Amino acid sequence: MLPATLGLRQNLRQFILLVIVNAFVGGMIGLERSILPLIAEQEFHLAATSAVLSFIVVFGIVKAITNYFTGTLANRFGRRKLLITGWIIAIPVPFLLMSADQWTWIVVANILLGLNQGLAWSATVVMKIDLVGERQRGFAMGLNEFAGYLAVALVAFLTGYIASHYGIRPYPFYI
């Protein structure tokens, strides 16, 4: 077996794929940030501030705990398996958000989303660093964050636009 070749140019295809995957991870957050406060107020009659705090706090705690274990899990089971597991966990999230008839289901969706983010986002970070090596680690991290947060902004804008024209459920979730 040949030794792995490090560097962005040498691994550009895999790197671009991981940037795209990370953008999808960020897109899930963008969808939530624009739509859930509206759902909280209009459908569940919750104050937007309370609602935002409840789902963001739950998401943040779960993501932080998952991040803590992700490095060890990645070394034990492999980065690819972690990334796939993170996405499998995320599959029900849009469906839960689209059909939730109680705020509890929104919170449950955010627990799953926190697990997804902790596994998938973190796995893409580690995988990118593995591909480019230590010398280009900062650049890899910068692209990772740029792609993720650009997707947050674009999807938040797009879902907000869709919600303002077609309603807050279900159309924004089809993205």
Predicted regions and their residues:
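Short hydrophobic/alpha-helical segments at membrane-entry points of transmembrane helices
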Residues: 18, 104-110
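Helix-loop boundary and gating motifs at the non-cytosolic
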Residues: 9-60
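A membrane-interface helix-boundary motif in multi-pass transporters
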Residues: 164-175
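Residue-level signature of mid-helix packing/kink "hotspots" within the transmembrane helices
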Residues: 60-68, 153
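Helix-to-loop junctions at the C-terminal end of transmembrane segments
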Residues: 66-78, 163
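Cytoplasmic helix-loop-helix junction between adjacent transmembrane helices
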Residues: 111-148
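C-terminal ends and interior cores of transmembrane alpha-helices
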Residues: 88-101
